[in-house]
Amino acid sequence: MTTARNMGELAGFAIPRLGMGTMALAIEGRPDRDTAIRTIHAGLDAGVRYLDTAWSYYLPSQPGTGTAEDLGYGEKMVRDALASWDGPRDEVLIATKTGYRRTMEAPNVAENKPERQHLQAVGSQYGWMADSRPETMICDAKESAAHLGVEALDQIGRASCR
Protein backbone atom coordinates (compact mmCIF):
# COMPACT_ATOMS: atom_id res chain seq x y z
CA MET A 1 0.00 0.00 0.00
CA THR A 2 1.25 3.46 -0.90
CA THR A 3 1.22 6.34 1.58
CA ALA A 4 -1.11 9.12 0.45
CA ARG A 5 0.11 12.70 0.06
CA ASN A 6 -1.98 15.84 0.11
CA MET A 7 -1.81 19.01 -2.00
CA GLY A 8 -2.75 21.19 0.93
CA GLU A 9 -5.80 22.20 2.92
CA LEU A 10 -9.06 23.92 2.08
CA ALA A 11 -11.43 24.98 4.85
CA GLY A 12 -9.59 22.68 7.25
CA PHE A 13 -9.83 19.61 5.02
CA ALA A 14 -6.82 17.88 3.47
CA ILE A 15 -6.95 17.84 -0.33
CA PRO A 16 -5.55 14.57 -1.74
CA ARG A 17 -3.06 14.64 -4.63
CA LEU A 18 -4.37 11.51 -6.32
CA GLY A 19 -7.98 11.16 -7.40
CA MET A 20 -9.97 8.63 -9.35
CA GLY A 21 -13.15 9.18 -11.34
CA THR A 22 -15.70 6.38 -11.35
CA MET A 23 -18.02 7.28 -14.25
CA ALA A 24 -16.59 4.64 -16.62
CA LEU A 25 -17.17 2.02 -13.90
CA ALA A 26 -20.88 2.88 -13.57
CA ILE A 27 -22.47 3.87 -16.89
CA GLU A 28 -22.88 2.14 -20.28
CA GLY A 29 -19.85 0.07 -21.23
CA ARG A 30 -19.08 -0.48 -17.55
CA PRO A 31 -17.27 -3.59 -16.33
CA ASP A 32 -18.98 -6.09 -14.06
CA ARG A 33 -19.38 -4.96 -10.45
CA ASP A 34 -16.58 -7.15 -9.02
CA THR A 35 -14.10 -5.84 -11.59
CA ALA A 36 -15.16 -2.25 -10.84
CA ILE A 37 -14.68 -2.75 -7.10
CA ARG A 38 -11.28 -4.39 -7.64
CA THR A 39 -10.32 -1.41 -9.83
CA ILE A 40 -11.23 1.02 -7.04
CA HIS A 41 -9.29 -1.10 -4.53
CA ALA A 42 -6.24 -1.04 -6.82
CA GLY A 43 -6.44 2.75 -7.02
CA LEU A 44 -6.78 3.09 -3.26
CA ASP A 45 -3.88 0.69 -2.71
CA ALA A 46 -1.78 2.82 -5.10
CA GLY A 47 -2.44 5.94 -3.01
CA VAL A 48 -5.68 7.38 -4.41
CA ARG A 49 -7.48 9.24 -1.63
CA TYR A 50 -10.09 11.15 -3.66
CA LEU A 51 -12.97 9.29 -5.32
CA ASP A 52 -15.24 11.17 -7.69
CA THR A 53 -18.74 9.85 -8.36
CA ALA A 54 -22.16 11.32 -9.17
CA TRP A 55 -25.83 10.84 -8.50
CA SER A 56 -26.34 10.34 -12.25
CA TYR A 57 -23.87 7.48 -12.73
CA TYR A 58 -26.38 4.77 -13.64
CA LEU A 59 -28.00 3.27 -16.74
CA PRO A 60 -31.26 4.97 -17.77
CA SER A 61 -34.38 2.87 -18.19
CA GLN A 62 -37.25 5.34 -18.68
CA PRO A 63 -36.89 8.21 -21.16
CA GLY A 64 -36.46 11.62 -19.60
CA THR A 65 -37.51 10.66 -16.08
CA GLY A 66 -34.23 9.97 -14.33
CA THR A 67 -35.83 6.79 -12.97
CA ALA A 68 -33.68 3.72 -13.43
CA GLU A 69 -33.50 0.16 -12.23
CA ASP A 70 -29.98 0.74 -10.97
CA LEU A 71 -30.43 4.32 -9.74
CA GLY A 72 -27.51 5.17 -7.46
CA TYR A 73 -25.32 2.44 -8.95
CA GLY A 74 -22.09 4.47 -9.03
CA GLU A 75 -22.42 5.83 -5.51
CA LYS A 76 -23.44 2.44 -4.08
CA MET A 77 -20.46 0.85 -5.84
CA VAL A 78 -18.10 3.39 -4.20
CA ARG A 79 -19.75 2.67 -0.83
CA ASP A 80 -19.30 -1.09 -1.27
CA ALA A 81 -15.70 -0.72 -2.48
CA LEU A 82 -14.78 1.33 0.58
CA ALA A 83 -16.61 -1.05 2.93
CA SER A 84 -14.64 -4.02 1.57
CA TRP A 85 -11.27 -2.23 1.41
CA ASP A 86 -8.83 -2.90 4.24
CA GLY A 87 -7.23 0.55 4.15
CA PRO A 88 -7.91 3.72 6.18
CA ARG A 89 -11.42 4.88 5.12
CA ASP A 90 -11.05 8.12 7.10
CA GLU A 91 -8.27 9.21 4.70
CA VAL A 92 -10.51 8.97 1.60
CA LEU A 93 -12.43 12.02 0.40
CA ILE A 94 -15.57 11.20 -1.61
CA ALA A 95 -16.88 13.83 -4.00
CA THR A 96 -20.26 13.48 -5.65
CA LYS A 97 -22.20 15.63 -8.05
CA THR A 98 -25.78 16.45 -8.99
CA GLY A 99 -27.44 18.49 -11.72
CA TYR A 100 -28.01 15.90 -14.45
CA ARG A 101 -30.46 13.07 -15.15
CA ARG A 102 -29.85 10.17 -17.54
CA THR A 103 -32.13 9.83 -20.56
CA MET A 104 -32.63 7.00 -23.02
CA GLU A 105 -31.55 9.30 -25.84
CA ALA A 106 -30.35 12.83 -26.30
CA PRO A 107 -32.24 14.83 -28.95
CA ASN A 108 -30.35 16.93 -31.45
CA VAL A 109 -30.45 20.29 -29.65
CA ALA A 110 -29.75 22.15 -32.91
CA GLU A 111 -33.06 20.92 -34.34
CA ASN A 112 -35.21 21.14 -31.25
CA LYS A 113 -34.54 23.38 -28.25
CA PRO A 114 -35.53 21.27 -25.23
CA GLU A 115 -36.83 22.80 -22.00
CA ARG A 116 -33.59 21.69 -20.34
CA GLN A 117 -30.19 21.09 -21.87
CA HIS A 118 -29.62 17.58 -23.24
CA LEU A 119 -26.15 16.20 -23.89
CA GLN A 120 -24.97 12.97 -25.40
CA ALA A 121 -21.80 11.06 -24.64
CA VAL A 122 -19.72 10.30 -27.73
CA GLY A 123 -20.65 6.88 -29.09
CA SER A 124 -23.53 6.47 -26.64
CA GLN A 125 -27.21 6.01 -27.33
CA TYR A 126 -27.96 7.53 -23.92
CA GLY A 127 -27.99 11.18 -22.97
CA TRP A 128 -27.83 13.56 -20.05
CA MET A 129 -30.52 16.10 -19.17
CA ALA A 130 -29.59 19.13 -17.07
CA ASP A 131 -31.69 19.62 -13.93
CA SER A 132 -30.11 21.99 -11.42
CA ARG A 133 -33.25 23.26 -9.76
CA PRO A 134 -32.61 23.80 -6.03
CA GLU A 135 -35.29 21.32 -4.99
CA THR A 136 -33.78 18.66 -7.26
CA MET A 137 -30.26 19.23 -5.96
CA ILE A 138 -31.40 19.06 -2.32
CA CYS A 139 -33.25 15.80 -2.98
CA ASP A 140 -30.26 14.38 -4.88
CA ALA A 141 -27.88 15.31 -2.05
CA LYS A 142 -30.02 13.40 0.45
CA GLU A 143 -30.22 10.40 -1.87
CA SER A 144 -26.45 10.55 -2.49
CA ALA A 145 -25.77 10.41 1.25
CA ALA A 146 -28.02 7.35 1.52
CA HIS A 147 -26.38 5.68 -1.51
CA LEU A 148 -22.92 6.32 -0.04
CA GLY A 149 -23.99 5.17 3.43
CA VAL A 150 -22.98 8.41 5.16
CA GLU A 151 -24.78 10.97 7.30
CA ALA A 152 -22.93 13.90 5.71
CA LEU A 153 -21.31 14.19 2.28
CA ASP A 154 -17.59 14.96 2.13
CA GLN A 155 -18.07 17.10 -0.98
CA ILE A 156 -20.94 17.77 -3.39
CA GLY A 157 -20.96 19.89 -6.49
CA ARG A 158 -23.05 20.68 -9.52
CA ALA A 159 -22.07 18.59 -12.53
CA SER A 160 -21.20 20.65 -15.55
CA CYS A 161 -20.36 19.69 -19.09
CA ARG A 162 -19.18 23.17 -20.08
What are these regions, as identified by a protein language model?
Residues M1-L93, K97:
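N-terminal binding-site loop/beta-alpha segment at the start of enzyme catalytic domains
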Residues Y58, R101-R102, S160-R162:
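Short, small-residue-enriched loops and turns at beta-alpha junctions
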Residues L71-S84, E105-V109, A141, G149, ...:
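Distinct, well-ordered alpha-helical segments
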Residues V109-R162:
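Glycine/proline-rich, positively charged
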Residues R89-N112:
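Glycine-rich, aromatic-flanked loop segments that form ligand/cofactor-binding clefts
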Residues P63-D70, E105-L119:
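Aromatic- and acidic-residue-enriched segments that line the glycan-binding/catalytic groove
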